[in-house]
Design a protein with these regions (language model features):
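Soluble catalytic domains of membrane acyltransferases
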Residues: 48-148
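A transmembrane-helix-recognition feature enriched in membrane-embedded lipid enzymes
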Residues: 1-55, 103-107
Length: 148
Protein backbone atom coordinates (compact mmCIF):
# COMPACT_ATOMS: atom_id res chain seq x y z
CA UNK A 1 0.00 0.00 0.00
CA UNK A 2 1.41 3.38 -0.88
CA UNK A 3 2.37 5.96 1.71
CA UNK A 4 0.51 8.58 -0.34
CA UNK A 5 -2.71 6.57 -0.10
CA UNK A 6 -2.38 6.11 3.66
CA UNK A 7 -1.57 9.81 4.13
CA UNK A 8 -4.57 11.02 2.12
CA UNK A 9 -6.82 8.48 3.86
CA UNK A 10 -6.04 9.95 7.29
CA UNK A 11 -6.11 13.51 5.98
CA UNK A 12 -9.53 12.95 4.46
CA UNK A 13 -10.76 11.42 7.73
CA UNK A 14 -10.17 14.82 9.34
CA UNK A 15 -11.61 16.71 6.35
CA UNK A 16 -14.79 14.60 6.23
CA UNK A 17 -15.08 14.82 10.01
CA UNK A 18 -14.97 18.62 9.93
CA UNK A 19 -17.25 18.93 6.89
CA UNK A 20 -19.96 16.71 8.32
CA UNK A 21 -19.65 17.79 11.95
CA UNK A 22 -22.60 20.22 11.86
CA UNK A 23 -24.94 17.56 10.43
CA UNK A 24 -23.67 14.92 12.84
CA UNK A 25 -24.32 17.24 15.77
CA UNK A 26 -27.90 17.80 14.63
CA UNK A 27 -28.76 14.13 14.23
CA UNK A 28 -27.54 10.59 13.85
CA UNK A 29 -28.42 10.64 10.13
CA UNK A 30 -25.68 13.22 9.63
CA UNK A 31 -23.18 10.94 11.34
CA UNK A 32 -24.21 8.01 9.12
CA UNK A 33 -23.87 10.25 6.07
CA UNK A 34 -20.36 11.26 7.16
CA UNK A 35 -19.21 7.73 7.86
CA UNK A 36 -20.68 6.35 4.64
CA UNK A 37 -19.27 9.22 2.53
CA UNK A 38 -15.82 8.64 3.99
CA UNK A 39 -16.09 4.90 3.28
CA UNK A 40 -17.02 5.61 -0.34
CA UNK A 41 -14.07 8.00 -0.60
CA UNK A 42 -11.62 5.41 0.73
CA UNK A 43 -12.96 2.73 -1.64
CA UNK A 44 -12.68 5.09 -4.62
CA UNK A 45 -9.22 6.38 -3.71
CA UNK A 46 -7.96 2.84 -3.03
CA UNK A 47 -8.97 1.84 -6.52
CA UNK A 48 -7.58 4.98 -8.12
CA UNK A 49 -4.31 5.25 -6.18
CA UNK A 50 -3.28 1.65 -5.50
CA UNK A 51 -5.47 -0.43 -7.81
CA UNK A 52 -7.39 -2.10 -4.98
CA UNK A 53 -10.75 -3.18 -6.34
CA UNK A 54 -13.60 -4.09 -4.03
CA UNK A 55 -16.90 -5.77 -4.70
CA UNK A 56 -19.93 -6.27 -2.50
CA UNK A 57 -22.11 -9.27 -3.30
CA UNK A 58 -25.29 -10.78 -2.00
CA UNK A 59 -28.32 -9.47 -0.20
CA UNK A 60 -27.57 -6.53 2.06
CA UNK A 61 -29.37 -6.82 5.43
CA UNK A 62 -31.48 -3.80 6.30
CA UNK A 63 -33.16 -4.69 9.58
CA UNK A 64 -31.70 -5.30 12.99
CA UNK A 65 -29.19 -8.08 12.40
CA UNK A 66 -25.89 -9.28 13.77
CA UNK A 67 -23.07 -9.45 11.25
CA UNK A 68 -20.07 -11.56 12.26
CA UNK A 69 -17.06 -10.85 10.07
CA UNK A 70 -13.39 -11.77 9.98
CA UNK A 71 -11.23 -8.72 10.72
CA UNK A 72 -8.39 -8.88 8.19
CA UNK A 73 -7.54 -5.21 7.70
CA UNK A 74 -8.95 -1.70 8.02
CA UNK A 75 -10.63 -2.22 4.66
CA UNK A 76 -13.21 -4.76 5.84
CA UNK A 77 -14.79 -2.11 8.10
CA UNK A 78 -14.78 0.34 5.17
CA UNK A 79 -16.60 -2.19 2.97
CA UNK A 80 -19.20 -2.98 5.62
CA UNK A 81 -19.89 0.71 6.29
CA UNK A 82 -20.32 1.37 2.57
CA UNK A 83 -22.71 -1.59 2.20
CA UNK A 84 -25.13 -1.67 5.14
CA UNK A 85 -27.57 1.17 5.88
CA UNK A 86 -27.01 1.62 9.63
CA UNK A 87 -23.78 -0.03 10.73
CA UNK A 88 -22.62 -0.05 14.33
CA UNK A 89 -19.60 -1.96 15.51
CA UNK A 90 -18.47 -3.64 18.67
CA UNK A 91 -15.17 -1.78 19.01
CA UNK A 92 -12.31 -1.80 21.44
CA UNK A 93 -12.69 0.82 24.13
CA UNK A 94 -9.49 2.70 23.24
CA UNK A 95 -10.90 3.62 19.81
CA UNK A 96 -13.44 5.96 21.36
CA UNK A 97 -10.52 8.26 22.20
CA UNK A 98 -9.26 8.34 18.60
CA UNK A 99 -9.87 11.79 17.11
CA UNK A 100 -12.75 11.89 14.60
CA UNK A 101 -13.03 8.09 14.35
CA UNK A 102 -14.01 7.65 17.99
CA UNK A 103 -16.57 10.45 18.11
CA UNK A 104 -18.31 9.42 14.89
CA UNK A 105 -18.20 5.78 16.00
CA UNK A 106 -19.99 6.64 19.22
CA UNK A 107 -22.41 8.89 17.32
CA UNK A 108 -23.56 6.05 15.04
CA UNK A 109 -24.03 3.75 18.03
CA UNK A 110 -20.85 1.69 18.23
CA UNK A 111 -20.51 -0.25 21.48
CA UNK A 112 -17.16 -0.10 23.27
CA UNK A 113 -15.72 -3.09 25.13
CA UNK A 114 -12.47 -3.80 26.98
CA UNK A 115 -10.65 -6.20 24.69
CA UNK A 116 -8.42 -7.93 27.24
CA UNK A 117 -11.23 -8.82 29.64
CA UNK A 118 -13.22 -11.39 27.66
CA UNK A 119 -15.96 -12.24 30.18
CA UNK A 120 -16.48 -8.61 31.17
CA UNK A 121 -16.49 -7.58 27.49
CA UNK A 122 -19.22 -10.08 26.65
CA UNK A 123 -21.34 -9.01 29.63
CA UNK A 124 -21.00 -5.30 28.85
CA UNK A 125 -21.72 -5.89 25.17
CA UNK A 126 -24.91 -7.84 25.94
CA UNK A 127 -25.97 -5.23 28.51
CA UNK A 128 -25.40 -2.39 26.03
CA UNK A 129 -27.41 -4.14 23.32
CA UNK A 130 -30.25 -5.05 25.71
CA UNK A 131 -30.41 -1.57 27.26
CA UNK A 132 -32.21 -0.17 24.24
CA UNK A 133 -29.92 2.89 24.23
CA UNK A 134 -28.18 1.76 21.07
CA UNK A 135 -29.90 2.82 17.83
CA UNK A 136 -31.48 0.23 15.56
CA UNK A 137 -29.25 -1.07 12.81
CA UNK A 138 -26.78 -3.72 11.85
CA UNK A 139 -24.46 -4.73 14.69
CA UNK A 140 -21.06 -5.82 13.41
CA UNK A 141 -18.79 -7.96 15.54
CA UNK A 142 -15.40 -9.42 14.80
CA UNK A 143 -15.50 -12.66 16.87
CA UNK A 144 -11.75 -13.19 16.58
CA UNK A 145 -11.17 -9.75 18.04
CA UNK A 146 -8.35 -7.94 16.34
CA UNK A 147 -7.24 -8.06 12.74
CA UNK A 148 -4.73 -10.68 11.65
Amino acid sequence: MSAAFVFQMYLMLVVFGLLFLPWALIGRRGAYLAVRSYAYWVRWSARWMVGLRSEIRGIIPEGEVLIAAKHQSFFDAILIVSAVPKPKFIMKNSLKYAPVLGWFGLRIGCICVERGKRTQAIKSMVAAVNSGNSPAGQLIIYPQGTRI
